[in-house]
Amino acid sequence: MSIKERLGLVISDKMDKTVVVSIANRVTHKRYGKIVTKTKKYKVHDPNNNCQVGDLILINETRPLSKTKRWMFKEIKQKSLKLDKDTIGE
């Protein structure tokens, strides 16, 4: 059995050592044939609090770590482009 890996976008990092990742999946509607985007949210264990909102990260499935956490952070594929006042010079 292979380990499942997903690529998703961090939408919340307000919890300690946990981030919420949204993964979009495009499927065809069974009756109408229209392509619909479905999203699913996963709670992901981030032991060092590396992830920030807007990061594109790779996660993989693991044993249950809590009631809702079954995914582990693997690596950051793309950092978010958050601009704060120090970087823009205000």
Curated annotation (Swiss-Prot):
One of its GO terms (biological process) is translation. It comes from the Eukaryota. The keyword tRNA-binding does not apply. GO terms for molecular function: rRNA binding; structural constituent of ribosome. Keywords: Chloroplast, Plastid, Ribonucleoprotein, Ribosomal protein, RNA-binding, rRNA-binding. Its main location: plastid. GO terms for cellular component: chloroplast; cytosolic small ribosomal subunit. It is found in: Plastid, Chloroplast. One of the primary rRNA binding proteins, it binds specifically to the 5'-end of 16S ribosomal RNA. Part of the 30S ribosomal subunit. Belongs to the universal ribosomal protein uS17 family. This is Small ribosomal subunit protein uS17c. It comes from Guillardia theta (Cryptophyte).
